[in-house]
C-alpha cells in the first residue's frame, strides 16, 4: 500500500520529534518486553532457578530481532498481544523457550515496559522545558528595562517592562518543570513482579513459599529497570491514577504554551513583537503583505488538544473494576503516547519561537505614549492634593471630565490623545503644570519591575535549570 493511501497520525508525521516518536514505537515496546523477560530470567537464576547462561545468552542475542509478521499472525489467532510475542520470542530462542515469561503475567511486561517508556518520555521533555526557560530568560534579561504597556482585560492598565512580562511566562514553565521532576523522581514507580492480581502468588509457588526470595526478585528487577522503588500494592496493573498524574502534568504544559503563544499573537497584532519569519515564508496566498504568527497558532492548536487529553484518563481510572478491567487498554495505547508527542511538539515550537522572538521597542513606546496621559491621572490627582492646591472631589471631577472628552476625540474623530493639552490649558491645574513632564515619565511608574526580573532570574530560574546546563545549547529547528 502506498504510504499516502492510509491515515498517518500528524503528531508522528509532522510535529513531534523523532526521539519521542521512537520512544513510543512498537519496536521499542517489544524490545522492552524482551528485555524484561531477560531480566526476569537473570534474576530467577541468581535466586536459584535452574536457568543456564546459554538460555539467557540466546535471549540476549535475539532481543532486537523481532519477527513482527509472525507476531501479528499469532495475535490474530490468539487475540492476545503478549502471548503472541511470547510465542514469537520462543521460536527465535528454542533453548530458552521453557523459561520465557516464567511466573509472569501480561502486565509484567506490558505495564513495566509502559512505565519505562513514560519515564523516558519525561526525560525527553524535561530538557525541552529547561531550554524554553533558558531562551525566555535570555530575552527577559535583555528587555528587563524596556518599558511597555501592561494590559488587564486586554485593556490598557499600567506600564511594565517586556522583561517582566516574559518572566510571567517563565514562572508558569518553572511550575511545569517542577511537576515533571516530581513525576519522574517520586510518582512513577516500577510495577515489578506482582502476579495476576498483585498478590505475587505465582512467584510464591515458584519459590516454594520463600517470602524473602519473592521480595528479592521484585527488588532486583526494580533496580535492573532503572527505578528506585516499586509499588507495594497493585491490582493486575500499576495504579492507573499514575496516568492521571502524568496526563495532568502534560495538559498543564499545554495550558502554559497556549497562554504564552496567545500573548505573543496578541502582542503581534499590536506590532510590538513578532515570531520568527523566514525570508521566503508566505503569509497569505491572496495578501502578500501578511506576516501571520503561524508557529504560535500551531502551538495553540496542538496545546488545545493536549489540554483536554487528561480527562480520558480520569474516566479510565473510574472503570477499573476491582482488580482490573480491560477498559484501560485501547485508550491508553492512544492517549499516553499522543500526550507525550503533543507536549513534545508544543515545547519544540515554543523554543523555536523564543529563540527567534523579535521585539519592536519603538512601537512599544508609541503604544505606551498614546495611553500614558490616562495612566497618570491618579498621580496628577495625588500631586494636586498633596500640593494643597485642590479639593480631592472637585479635582477628581475635572480630571474625569477632561479624560472623557479626550477619549471621545480619540474614538469618534481619530485624534491623538489631548488630555495633557487640556490640563495645560486649564488654569485650575496651574500649580502642577511644571510637574507634568515628570509625571509623564513612565520610568517612575514601573515599580520594582527591573529589580524583580533580576532577582527572579538569579534566585529562581538559574538554580532550576542548572542541572540541565549540558543540554541547553541544542537549538530548535522547525521544518514545516
From Swiss-Prot:
Gene Ontology cellular-component annotations: cytosol
Keywords on record: Lyase, Nucleotide biosynthesis, Nucleotide-binding, Purine salvage
Entry binding sites for AMP: 14-15, 79-81, 236, 298, 329, 333
Keyword Nucleotide-binding among UniProt keywords: yes
Pathway(s) per entry: Purine metabolism; AMP biosynthesis via salvage pathway
InterPro entries, A to Z: AdenyloSucc_lyase_C (IPR019468), Fumarase/histidase_N (IPR024083), Fumarate_lyase_CS (IPR020557), Fumarate_lyase_fam (IPR000362), Fumarate_lyase_N (IPR022761), L-Aspartase-like (IPR008948), Pur_lyase (IPR004769)
Catalytic activity: N(6)-(1,2-dicarboxyethyl)-AMP = fumarate + AMP
Enzyme class: lyase
Coiled coil: none
A Pfam family it matches: ADSL_C
Active-site annotation: 153 (proton donor/acceptor), 284 (proton donor/acceptor)
Amino acids binding N(6)-(1,2-dicarboxyethyl)-AMP: 236, 285, 290, 292, 324, 329, 333
Positions contributing to fumarate binding: 80, 236, 285, 290, 292
Domain of life: Eukaryota
PROSITE patterns to which the protein is assigned, alphabetical: FUMARATE_LYASES (PS00163)
GO BP terms, alphabetized: 'de novo' AMP biosynthetic process; 'de novo' IMP biosynthetic process; AMP biosynthetic process; AMP salvage; purine nucleotide salvage; purine ribonucleoside salvage
GO terms, molecular function: (S)-2-(5-amino-1-(5-phospho-D-ribosyl)imidazole-4-carboxamido) succinate lyase (fumarate-forming) activity; N6-(1,2-dicarboxyethyl)AMP AMP-lyase (fumarate-forming) activity; nucleotide binding
General function of this protein: Catalyzes conversion of succinyladenosine monophosphate (SAMP) to AMP and fumarate on the purine salvage pathway.
Subunit structure, interactors included: Homotetramer.
PANTHER family in alphabetical order: ADENYLOSUCCINATE LYASE
Family per similarity comment: Belongs to the lyase 1 family. Adenylosuccinate lyase subfamily.
The name this protein goes by in its record: Adenylosuccinate lyase
Organism this protein belongs to: Schistosoma mansoni (Blood fluke)
Gene name for this UniProt entry: ASL
